[in-house]
Amino acid sequence: MSMTSSVRVEWIAAVTIAAGTAAIGYLAYKRFYVKDHRNKSMVNPHIQKDNPKVVHAFDMEDLGDKAVYCRCWRSKKFPLCDGSHTKHNEETGDNVGPLIIKKKDT
């Protein structure tokens, strides 16, 4: 075996080991890191989790002059807004705000 042939074999072995290590690292990243982000991006973290679909309905006549509803799902007074979206926006970089329903000024 010549000198260039043995160098070529060493390079092939090194590239194979590096590619295998990169593949294992990528699979570990996908398994452990990406999974955590999927759970953190869930819109509703804790409100009525036993219910398959959370729905609230209100009669327009019962709202009064103004009603402010939560859209970030973090409010302790859900479905009403308590300003929790401010902290949520700071933590996530989101820009969600409340839904404000008010009577039209005549």
From Swiss-Prot:
The modification N6-acetyllysine is found at K53, K66, K102. The active site is at K53 (schiff-base intermediate with pyridoxal 5'-phosphate). Its cofactor is [2Fe-2S] cluster; pyridoxal 5'-phosphate. PANTHER family: CDGSH IRON-SULFUR DOMAIN-CONTAINING PROTEIN 1. GO terms for cellular component: mitochondrial outer membrane. It comes from Bos taurus. The keyword Metal-binding applies. Its EC number is 2.6.1.3. This is CDGSH iron-sulfur domain-containing protein 1. Keywords: 2Fe-2S, Acetylation, Iron, Iron-sulfur, Isopeptide bond, Membrane, Metal-binding, Mitochondrion, Mitochondrion outer membrane, Schiff base, Signal-anchor, Transferase, Transmembrane, Transmembrane helix, Ubl conjugation. The modification N-acetylserine is found at S2. Residues 30-106 are cytoplasmic. L-cysteine transaminase that catalyzes the reversible transfer of the amino group from L-cysteine to the alpha-keto acid 2-oxoglutarate to respectively form 2-oxo-3-sulfanylpropanoate and L-glutamate. It is found in: Mitochondrion outer membrane. One of its GO terms (biological process) is protein maturation.
